[in-house]
Amino acid sequence: MSDYSLKHSVTQYLEEIPQQVQNRLYTSPATCLAIYRILPPLAKFFIMAMVFNENEVPLLDLDKWVNSNGKLQFQNAIKSMKSLHLLIPNKSSGTLMINLNPTFKISLRNALTGGEVQNSFGVVVEENVVSLDLLDEYSANKWETILHFMVGTPLAKIPSEKVLNLLKHSKLMEEVNSTGEFKITNEGFQFLLQEINSQLWTLLLQYLKMIETSKMDLVDVLHFIFMLGALEVGKAYKIDALSETQRIMLQDMRDYGLVFQKHSNDSIFYPTKLALMLTSDTKTIRSASNAMDSVLRQNREEPSVNEDGANGKSTTDITTSDDLNKAGLKNQDIPDGSLIVETNFKIYSYSNSPLQIAVLSLFVHLKARFVNMVLGQITRESIRRALTNGITADQIIAYLETHAHPQMRRLAEEKLEKKLELDPNCKEPLQVLPPTVVDQIRLWQLELDRVITYEGSLYSDFETSQEYNLLSKYAQDIGVLLWKDDKKKKFFISKEGNSQVLDFAKRKLKKKQ
């Protein structure tokens, strides 16, 4: 899920809730600030232009601020703001005037200026401060436990019953009736390839749908989620300032690693870095496994590995620390899980995380594992296995690009700069991955796309050509015929049309007898 898709999913959920609930949401400055952050860029611009303006603004004036190339973005921004009831239209003297929702305007203004926020951003407790390392390690343990469970890693302690229930309702995992064990679904495989903020919101959106059937107040739930994204990591916050619904939520948020408490009955809680990602655009943590690996990262030199090619001449050189220093890259600047992808489809992952390796094995044939690196090969079989599990070629390519080694990105940028020097009008995009690898992964997907499976019934062994022609023509007339072979007197019909053809056959063939 891209950053745009993530924000679209969240705003779409907010757009679908009743207007009365939306208006209650806008009473919280923290919530209004969070909603502002996930709106389209043009919508943010319009809001900033109106939030401190007491007068109505002609809609035509907003249209004039956008050039001809941005008309589609303009329409999307206005549509989103109207769906959220952020814009209040007023048609006077033939001109359509608009203004911001007054409740939203006041709350956002207070959030921006530090006005009357009414504990919207929590109540800070100055003492009982804990270290950031402790919070990082705690959130790492909680979140990776969920992801390890999904990929089937043996665990000493599995996630809580509520987390398992959420994974099942999200259709990321399914329970095997015969054994009671959980297994990952196609959606679950795709979930593992998303960035961590997308993963968090995938679970939280399902969490919101589940609590709609409970007695919990939806507005209080949303207030708490958006508030967590605005709190400061490392500071303690009073639980007494929370509503009854939000106190119940605290246990669930602990299970996800969003908040930390020294003891379950403590009167304070601490937000973690995971909570900040709910409303942040930061990409400092690029994926769930990468985020958690960063907690345990150590400064270490990367070894040099040489492999003879098939013809005995080609050599694969893994970047050494000296090479990286020359390129302006230090060891600590290289995120764990960084990948090097070569034109011969070999892949090197700088990681010793079992989770990172497990995710990589979803579409890579792993060959060897070293202290801080894994060697693998992208093969037709490994890609087809991933494709049949619901992962798309674009998702695999996006994952490889997102986790590309900084040296690969640097070389791609230098190559593009040289092309632009020769041809300033060159519109070729930045190619971080080898084009041969990207094209081949897409071709392997096309192989599977050529084959479409249908459920249905095969009719054959007809005694006469008349019987075959009668039934095949009837199946074709009612639109359920999927395939036929007149020479072999066989045809295949859809599952939905089988009962109709059988009834027709019984009536017509019985008359002939």
UniProtKB/Swiss-Prot annotation:
Protein origin, superkingdom: Eukaryota
Q: Alphabetically, which GO biological process terms does the record hold? A: nucleotide-excision repair; transcription by RNA polymerase II; transcription initiation at RNA polymerase II promoter
Q: Which GO terms describe its cellular component?
A: nucleotide-excision repair factor 3 complex; transcription factor TFIIH core complex; transcription factor TFIIH holo complex
Q: Keywords on this record?
A: DNA damage, DNA excision, DNA repair, Nucleus, Transcription, Transcription regulation
How it assembles, according to the record, is:
Component of the 7-subunit TFIIH core complex composed of XPB/SSL2, XPD/RAD3, SSL1, TFB1, TFB2, TFB4 and TFB5, which is active in NER. The core complex associates with the 3-subunit CTD-kinase module TFIIK composed of CCL1, KIN28 and TFB3 to form the 10-subunit holoenzyme (holo-TFIIH) active in transcription. An additionnal subunit, TFB6, plays a role in the dissociation of the SSL2 helicase from TFIIH after transcription initiation. Interacts with TFB5.
Q: What else is known?
A: Present with 8900 molecules/cell in log phase SD medium.
Biological role stated in the UniProt entry? Component of the general transcription and DNA repair factor IIH (TFIIH) core complex, which is involved in general and transcription-coupled nucleotide excision repair (NER) of damaged DNA and, when complexed to TFIIK, in RNA transcription by RNA polymerase II. In NER, TFIIH acts by opening DNA around the lesion to allow the excision of the damaged oligonucleotide and its replacement by a new DNA fragment. In transcription, TFIIH has an essential role in transcription initiation.
Q: What is this protein called?
A: General transcription and DNA repair factor IIH subunit TFB2
Q: Which organism is it from?
A: Saccharomyces cerevisiae (strain ATCC 204508 / S288c) (Baker's yeast)
| Record lineage | Eukaryota, Fungi, Dikarya, Ascomycota, Saccharomycotina
